[in-house]
Amino acid sequence: MLTGAASAFSADTGFARSLQSPVSRQSKPLVSGLTQDTRLYGSTAVEIGGKAKLDGLKISVDCSDSSSMKWNVTVPEEGEFDLFLSCAVSVPGFKLEIRSGSSSVKVELRVTEGIYQQTEGGWYFNFERIRLDGKLHLTRGVNPVSVQVSGPEQSGVVRFRCLEILPVPGSAAIIPSEESVRAHRANTDWFVKAGYGVMFHWTDFTQPRQGEKKPYKDAVDAFDVNAFSSMIEEMGAGYVVLTLNHAHPHCAAPIQSWEAIHPGWTTRRDLLGELADALAARNIRFLLYINSPTLTKLGNIGPTGLYQLTFSEEQFAEIHRDVLSEIGARYGKRLAGYWFDSWYQSLAAYPDVPIDAVYRACKVGNPERITCFNFWIFPVLTPYQDYWAGELNSLHNPFTSRYIQQGAGKGFQAHALLSTLESWVHSKPGPIPAPQFSAEDLIAYVRANVEHQAVTTINIGIYQDGTVEQSSMDMMRQLRRAIRGK
């Protein structure tokens, strides 16, 4: 966790923020008080010892027998604290002890479960967020907090993502009841009824099948909305998710608040509005993908594995509020949802960001607009979303219920995001490769999800002119006939 004035707790990381001048404020600050949740990541530990090893991306720590981590945590008042552990456990027999001074909490870890098919040496592991039995006592001031892992002398590790420390009196306010959480979520019935939809990473990196790539704004002007929408209808997709930005902050619409943050990156043509209208005429819903770090100019990964910051926490929230409010008011019910990327990184960089305020901004113009924040394989650390982002890429285990029972997305509407590409963007010149899975396997997966009221989104490689490769089209036609019966 980063040290900051808005934090009730701080963990000593030695990592400083870089701030630019504030963005214009249209209303009262979104970060107005102290939050009482602190998260300790392996990348910000002051010590990593024994057999513990920070992974190459600095986003989790592999712990086998005799592994340890340590942080220095500052708290304003002495008290008792609840503990939540986000980890993946591959084999039984691991034990964990969290200690500060004479206070300690011990736990025997069970094997974690979820929908990911775990692969040796791969990234797909079933992380869960576990509430630990017992309280940790911390005194006012600086407290050394250590995590010690012991386990069987065999193959297998505990993958540590983070430890959350919450004051007991504040836990009820920070962790709403299941009833109150569900009460503020949008209805996902239409999403479930759709069964499956498609996503396109159509960006300034997207290549044509042949010839020279056009500048992004020229590609926007040349985009054939009717041909694209007819293609989606032929695929049988119930909705489309389109990248508004990705690696670069382009925006295919004249959004003034976006232009204020990223001058020159918006377009005169309102391609988003035209697509929303053309798809709606075919009873197909329209959603937007937004990469939050790109929107808010998060810089390179720093020495702690966290983004180097351009804006303050308050500015990060205000940028989202301003942009989402304008987009929401402009498109109203024509915009059915959002899929926000890179939020496990965003929340690590901005630990006190008021996600509830960002979530509320998502509803401007359409209270039933569905929203998710992508935490990838890691547990979702906010109740303020309507469905699980479900970034899978390849085929994994299908869901067994509408609301996820175990794993990273526990409690949320079940949703899987696949990709016909091994990556997400067709960024190399030439033909798009054939899908990485067969039509038969995709049909079986989508059908199994539909039977349990889970939703599947298929990211399809797309050319700059808005067309797809014939092999992808053939696969989607087969899926349509199998699922839609026509």
For each feature predicted by the language model, list its residue ranges.
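Mature catalytic domains of secreted/periplasmic carbohydrate-active enzymes
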Residues: 15-77, 81-486
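N-terminal export signals
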Residues: 1-11
